[in-house]
């Protein structure tokens, strides 16, 4: 007689990316956070593995930690300079990002035709973690089949939300996620043709 197979819960860093939220990790208001040098940031309970994984929703603190410390979003370990890969980033000219409203976050001396790797809110991962990360990602994030090496230079762009102070009711800007933009040495002489229309 065959023994019943008891399903194992998903393992963080193996089946489920380290950076994702879990259903028991409720929002926790806004307050100072070391991930943004003490600035006000959106906060969230820290209970990885509690409840059900929410693969399409990054945990606020773990996301900021992953970008600031270059931690692999799959396993949560540091990525060395020679082992940083982006599965979801897109190459675009700096001028296109400026046209989308990210101009103040990019270095002033970065030419508009310089190609950057816009990684959004997903930090680079280890090459060895790529297959597991791809299996765990929602299909909508896998539109581009290419794995891209992450450039040696980058900038971090804080993304803000409006948070309400519980006592005064006043709204304050709070960092939600950190966007990561890698800076390449490539140029796109036709970058203006890729500007948003309208």
Walk through the language-model features, giving the residues of each:
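Polybasic, low-complexity binding patches
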Residues: 115, 121, 133-159
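N-terminal alpha-helical interaction blocks
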Residues: 1-69, 149-198
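Non-catalytic terminal/accessory regions
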Residues: 47-54, 74-78, 82
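Short metal-coordination and nucleic-acid-contact micro-motifs, chiefly zinc-binding Cys/His arrays
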Residues: 65-71, 119-122
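Short Cys/His-rich "knuckle" micro-motifs
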Residues: 79-87, 133-139
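Short cysteine/histidine-rich metal-coordination sites, predominantly Zn2+-binding motifs
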Residues: 87-97, 141-150
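Short linker/helix segments within small regulatory modules
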Residues: 103-123
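Short cysteine-rich clusters marking metal-coordination/redox-active sites
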Residues: 72-75, 126-129
